[in-house]
């Protein structure tokens, strides 16, 4: 056996999550590993009929202070920190026996404090002290000691012991050490973030400041990327430790080439836009901007309508659907155009089978979920901008009619549709829509009136008529020229935030043209 393999003869098990505990303990006992344990863990092992020695018996000190002190003892930490070939004499002198394996997971601080009714006292009692101390001791001494922090690690740990006659490799011990230090860092960050957000420690259930004096973030790498935004930039994708269900980070790639930085940025824009619709919808995104969006009777209908908005820009785009993608729609897409990424909550067997004919197309499955990100962040030079996420919806009852003519029922439906799309278009954003489909999109211009003209131009290029359509603007019109441009194109109704110093002039312009206009009181800048 290679010298970097070391036997496991003595293990200390102390876990709050009992998942897989008994199977692990039974496998270790079968290899004649002596088990040490504490409190509820020892009780569970003993009730399973397995031999275990209490840490209190080892140290000669009982668990005290309601369990706050039980493993903070030289006989425990010396057993974890003792170095092979260096500390044997000292350990023998003080009666310290080596511990070769530590299996420990921490008090559930994160899951306790995520509850809105969590009291400060509950939070404090779930701050583990002895656990992180032992993890650090064992992880520091990876040259001799192995440490497991998660039930998901048990199977690989036992497999290596089985394959190597009860021994673990240096590579395995080091990998487990890194995972342990990461876990301690995550745990301490969660405690720091929670306590930093407590606005008043005198409150039983403290109010939490959404923007505390200090924040600590932890992300897990999902994959390396081919490159960053440009080929001369390197890149990788990381996800939150606890990703929100239904968001992009929960995707499963079913086929296709490796994802790029731009693929993921565009995919996020497409997915977030499409998941706000209840009826079958398709969103086509290019360079983080929707170039076609539609709601239809099914995926195929929605795709045809969305594609018709801007067939030229749809080349090399990202397509997102909010319903299971069927074979007929998959065939229609892949036979017609080059696609970078397909996204849907699921695919029928025929759709996946047909997609294999275009092996390079990246096919992503994102399970349904109603969760929303609470915050957005953006890096700037040596700093971080942080804000609450723009999750503001809009209902008919919130709209204020400000013109002489009120929108018709059909126009109101189209106005809300266009408003939802405009939220995901780069500012200055103008969206023309009719019958729950986009007719033209003007994005990212420094002048709002220019965005309006571009939306009309895109409609003309696609041979779609703007006459009778509605217009959504992500921010107010500073002058009447945007309304005049809309009227020239044939727009019949407008939705916008309002709030300009010249709202009166803008409203008067709409009345002159017989345009119905509603204010939302909400702006949707997107940069």
UniProtKB/Swiss-Prot annotation:
Belongs to the PurH family. SUPFAM superfamilies: Cytidine deaminase-like (SSF53927), Methylglyoxal synthase-like (SSF52335). The IMP cyclohydrolase activity resides in the N-terminal region. SMART domains: AICARFT_IMPCHas (SM00798), MGS (SM00851). It comes from the Bacteria. Pathway: Purine metabolism; IMP biosynthesis via de novo pathway; 5-formamido-1-(5-phospho-D-ribosyl)imidazole-4-carboxamide from 5-amino-1-(5-phospho-D-ribosyl)imidazole-4-carboxamide (10-formyl THF route): step 1/1; Purine metabolism; IMP biosynthesis via de novo pathway; IMP from 5-formamido-1-(5-phospho-D-ribosyl)imidazole-4-carboxamide: step 1/1. Residues 1-149 form the MGS-like domain. GO terms for molecular function: IMP cyclohydrolase activity; phosphoribosylaminoimidazolecarboxamide formyltransferase activity. It comes from Xanthomonas oryzae pv. oryzae (strain MAFF 311018). Keywords: Hydrolase, Multifunctional enzyme, Purine biosynthesis, Transferase. The keyword ATP-binding does not apply. Coiled coil: none annotated. InterPro entries: AICAR_Tfase_dup_dom_sf, Cytidine_deaminase-like, MGS-like_dom, MGS-like_dom_sf, PurH-like. It catalyses: (6R)-10-formyltetrahydrofolate + 5-amino-1-(5-phospho-beta-D-ribosyl)imidazole-4-carboxamide = 5-formamido-1-(5-phospho-D-ribosyl)imidazole-4-carboxamide + (6S)-5,6,7,8-tetrahydrofolate; IMP + H2O = 5-formamido-1-(5-phospho-D-ribosyl)imidazole-4-carboxamide. Gene3D superfamilies: 3.40.140.20, Methylglyoxal synthase-like domain. GO terms for cellular component: cytosol. This is Bifunctional purine biosynthesis protein PurH. One of its GO terms (biological process) is 'de novo' IMP biosynthetic process.
